[in-house]
């Protein structure tokens, strides 16, 4: 069942060439952080190109609950009048973060070092995800948390009245955990240090520096060492949100597997901590080029051009690349189905605790559509069948996971028989215009109204 109402089954069928321009929404990671850092700064932050998916709208609502003034001016233009570091008010009601693991974890961090309490909940998917990986480091600051068995939502977090700075080594690569600790460190005196053995997306570090925080990043023997000086006065900013590479993945990958396709995806953020999928696709032999490369707001940006690539070859994806493409493995596994040979993906334990167990969700759906998959605790291997040889014909469970739903709809565009997703409703959390955008390119996606 969809997180916001009755299930919305969709079926995707083989189509003619995908052509044209795919203007995907603003980056989800940067959209969340823009609202949260705007709320923690002094003055008015103006945001252009904000992703208006449900996840980000839930974060905007949460920032209002903590006392910030958040205004939607229309057309992706938003403003946030912040309350300053340490200025969060105690919310009157429960904070509902919907489907968003990013939203709830970052907000928990942002409030954990203020002398207030907040209760968090979400949809069925989010309430099943473990939160201890965030609440454990927040406890080091002095915050307390009370949730359901297994550290799950609903959960009340009691912020530290007298927070202390923390040095924390992130055990499993996670930008959400790292960011929660850094946001908590904002209102702790002294220096908070985060050490990550493998680099994860660095939007939080870049944006904290942009808002005026004293933050340094160094490479050491133990990994990346991020040092933040607490209790700064963050200054409001003007933010232009680049378009989301995780959303761009879907029209790009669809173009690679649908014969005759030629799709341009303009203005995509190519932060090196996010661009692992595109590097991997090129190594597989994808006809994927970067055009008009530039820097906007401190982030590298380019227009992506993807063309049908009939001779894709399976590869072993370097485990060190996992953090830079963790959300893209589901759709990569779809492309791998149309390649020749094995695509080996290791070091991806994080996929087991996303919106769904993404390895299990994709493996079962791929097998149902005639593709051989092997998997283990932190790895999986997809044996490609080559262009034109993927059967399709199955109904796949989305497990309330937007990326699983979109991945199987992309698959159906090039399989012999249509592919159905049991509930595509969660797509609205990150890519509300997915269906019309893909249809405009030439995809055949139908809602199954029973």
From Swiss-Prot:
Active site: 327 (proton acceptor)
Pathway assigned to this chain's UniProt record: Metabolic intermediate biosynthesis; chorismate biosynthesis; chorismate from D-erythrose 4-phosphate and phosphoenolpyruvate: step 6/7
GO cellular component, one term: cytoplasm
An annotated Gene Ontology molecular function: 3-phosphoshikimate 1-carboxyvinyltransferase activity
Annotated keywords: Amino-acid biosynthesis, Aromatic amino acid biosynthesis, Cytoplasm, Transferase
Annotated stretches, region: Disordered: 1-23
Coiled coil: none
UniProt enzyme class: transferase
Record's subcellular location: Cytoplasm
Catalytic activity line of the entry: 3-phosphoshikimate + phosphoenolpyruvate = 5-O-(1-carboxyvinyl)-3-phosphoshikimate + phosphate
Stored InterPro entries: Enolpyruvate_Tfrase_dom, Enolpyruvate_Tfrase_sf, EPSP_synthase, EPSP_synthase_CS, RNA3'P_cycl/enolpyr_Trfase_a/b
Stored PROSITE patterns: EPSP_SYNTHASE_1 (PS00104), EPSP_SYNTHASE_2 (PS00885)
UniProt EC number: 2.5.1.19
Keyword Cell wall biogenesis/degradation on entry: no
Keyword Cytoplasm: yes
Gene Ontology terms describing biological process: amino acid biosynthetic process; aromatic amino acid family biosynthetic process; chorismate biosynthetic process
Main subcellular localisation: cytoplasm
One matching Pfam family: EPSP_synthase
Domain of life: Bacteria
Chain sites annotated for binding phosphoenolpyruvate: 28, 101, 129, 176, 358, 403
Positions contributing to 3-phosphoshikimate binding: 28-29, 33, 174, 176, 327, 354
NCBIfam families cross-referenced by the UniProt entry: aroA (TIGR01356)
Cited function: Catalyzes the transfer of the enolpyruvyl moiety of phosphoenolpyruvate (PEP) to the 5-hydroxyl of shikimate-3-phosphate (S3P) to produce enolpyruvyl shikimate-3-phosphate and inorganic phosphate.
Subunit architecture: Monomer.
Family membership: Belongs to the EPSP synthase family.
Name the record gives this protein: 3-phosphoshikimate 1-carboxyvinyltransferase
Source species of the chain: Roseobacter denitrificans (strain ATCC 33942 / OCh 114) (Erythrobacter sp. (strain OCh 114))
């Amino acid at each position: 069942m969809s997180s916001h109402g009755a299930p919305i089954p969709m079926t995707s069928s083989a189509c003619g060439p995908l052509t044209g321009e795919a203007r995907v929404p603003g980056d989800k990671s940067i959209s969340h952080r823009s609202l949260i850092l705007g709320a923690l700064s002094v003055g008015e932050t103006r945001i252009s190109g904000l992703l208006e998916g449900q996840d980000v709208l839930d974060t905007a609502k949460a920032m209002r609950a903590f006392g910030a003034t958040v205004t939607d001016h229309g057309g992706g233009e938003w403003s946030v009048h912040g309350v300053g570091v340490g200025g969060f008010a105690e919310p009157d009601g429960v904070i509902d973060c919907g489907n968003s693991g990013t939203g709830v974890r970052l907000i928990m961090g942002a409030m954990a070092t203020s002398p207030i309490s907040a209760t968090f909940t979400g949809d069925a998917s989010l309430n099943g995800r473990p939160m201890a990986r965030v609440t454990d480091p927040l406890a080091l600051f002095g915050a307390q948390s009370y949730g359901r068995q297994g550290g799950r939502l609903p959960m009340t977090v009691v912020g530290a009245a007298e927070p202390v700075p923390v040095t924390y080594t992130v055990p499993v690569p996670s930008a959400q955990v790292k960011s929660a600790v850094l946001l908590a460190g904002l209102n702790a005196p002294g220096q908070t240090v985060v050490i990550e053995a493998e680099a994860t997306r660095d939007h939080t570090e870049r944006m904290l520096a942009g808002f005026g925080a004293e933050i340094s990043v160094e490479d050491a023997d133990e990994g990346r060492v991020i040092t933040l000086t607490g209790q700064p006065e963050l200054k409001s900013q003007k933010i232009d949100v680049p378009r989301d590479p995780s959303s761009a993945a879907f029209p790009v990958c669809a173009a690679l597997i649908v014969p005759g396709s030629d799709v341009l995806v303009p203005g995509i953020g190519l932060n090196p901590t996010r661009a692992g999928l595109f590097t991997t696709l090129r190594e597989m032999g994808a006809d994927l080029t970067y055009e008009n490369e530039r820097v906007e707001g401190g982030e590298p940006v380019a227009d992506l051009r993807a063309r049908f690539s009939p001779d894709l070859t399976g590869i072993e994806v370097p485990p060190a690349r996992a953090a830079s493409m963790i959300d893209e493995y589901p759709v990569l596994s779809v492309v791998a189905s149309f390649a020749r040979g094995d695509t080996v993906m290791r070091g991806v334990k994080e996929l087991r605790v996303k919106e769904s167990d993404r390895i299990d969700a994709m493996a079962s759906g791929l097998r149902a559509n005639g593709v051989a998959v092997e998997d283990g605790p932190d790895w999986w291997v997809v044996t490609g069948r080559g262009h034109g040889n993927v059967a399709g014909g199955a109904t796949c469970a989305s497990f309330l996971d937007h990326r699983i739903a979109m991945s199987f709809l992309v698959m159906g565009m090039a399989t012999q028989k249509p592919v159905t997703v049991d509930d595509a409703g969660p797509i609205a959390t990150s890519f509300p215009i997915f269906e019309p955008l893909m249809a405009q390119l030439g995809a055949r996606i139908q809602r199954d109204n029973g």
